[in-house]
C-alpha cells in the first residue's frame, strides 16, 4: 500500500515537471556560456595544470594529516630516533602487515614500560585521530596479551 502511494506520487511529480517545461540539467544546452564561446566544462586555464596521478619512483605517499608537523605548521615537541619516526609509506588499504602496526610494535619494544610512553609518543607524533585510535587499540592489545 505504501509502495503504491510512493510510486503514484513519483508519477505525479514527473508529470508536473514535464508539463512545466523544466529542462534536464544533463543536456549540453544548459551549460552556462562564457565570454569567448566556451563553457564551464571546456574552459582552459593556462596557468593551472592537473596532475597526471603518477609519482616519481622512490617517493613515499604521505597522507594529509597523517603525521604531526607534515604541513610545516608545528614541529614535534620531542624528536624520536630515526628508527622510531612515524611511517610515510602507508597504502591505507587495511592490509594485515600495516606499517603503522609495525610502528606501534617498534614503540613498544623501544620504551618497554608497559605502553605508557609508547602511547604518549603516539599522541605527540600522529595527527590523524582515526589512526591514533587504531594504534592505541593495537598497543593496549599487545600490552594485555604480551604479544
UniProtKB/Swiss-Prot annotation:
Residue ranges of coiled coil: none
Q: Where is this region: Disordered?
A: 36-82
Ranges of compositional bias, category Basic and acidic residues: 52-63
Which positions fall inside the Oxidoreductase-like domain?
A: 81-108
Question: What is a single cellular component term in the Gene Ontology annotation?
Answer: mitochondrion
Q: Where is the signal peptide?
A: none
Specify the protein name. Oxidoreductase-like domain-containing protein 1
Say which species the protein is native to: Homo sapiens
